């Protein structure tokens, strides 16, 4: 067993769309340093995630876990809803 097999990769992000059936779009923000000036810049990545029970709404803060590919673009599953939208 290698070191990466024992732990499931997880990320936290905000739900930006839930219009699809059992699928949510999650925006994951990260900060990167500008190569020349050193200022930290926000970068956003959008990923599709599987929401089996359609329980997420727009604005929720969620945790995603990596999984086997479910479709062409979807390889994440909903782990937990950390914070509900107001």
Curated annotation (Swiss-Prot):
Gene Ontology molecular function, alphabetical: rRNA binding; structural constituent of ribosome
GO biological process: translation
Highest taxon of source: Bacteria
Keyword terms: Ribonucleoprotein, Ribosomal protein, RNA-binding, rRNA-binding
Coiled-coil ranges per UniProt: none
GO cellular component, one term: cytosolic small ribosomal subunit
Family: Belongs to the universal ribosomal protein uS17 family.
Protein role: One of the primary rRNA binding proteins, it binds specifically to the 5'-end of 16S ribosomal RNA.
Subunit structure: Part of the 30S ribosomal subunit.
Protein name: Small ribosomal subunit protein uS17
């Amino acid at each position: 067993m290698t070191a990466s097999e024992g732990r499931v990769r997880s990320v936290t992000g905000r739900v930006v769309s839930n219009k699809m059936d059992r699928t949510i779009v999650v925006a994951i923000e990260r900060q990167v340093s500008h190569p020349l000036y050193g200022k930290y810049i926000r970068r956003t990545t959008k990923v599709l995630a599987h929401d089996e029970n359609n329980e997420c709404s727009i604005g929720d803060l969620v945790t995603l876990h990596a999984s086997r590919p479910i479709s062409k673009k979807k390889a994440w599953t909903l782990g937990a809803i950390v914070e509900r939208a107001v």
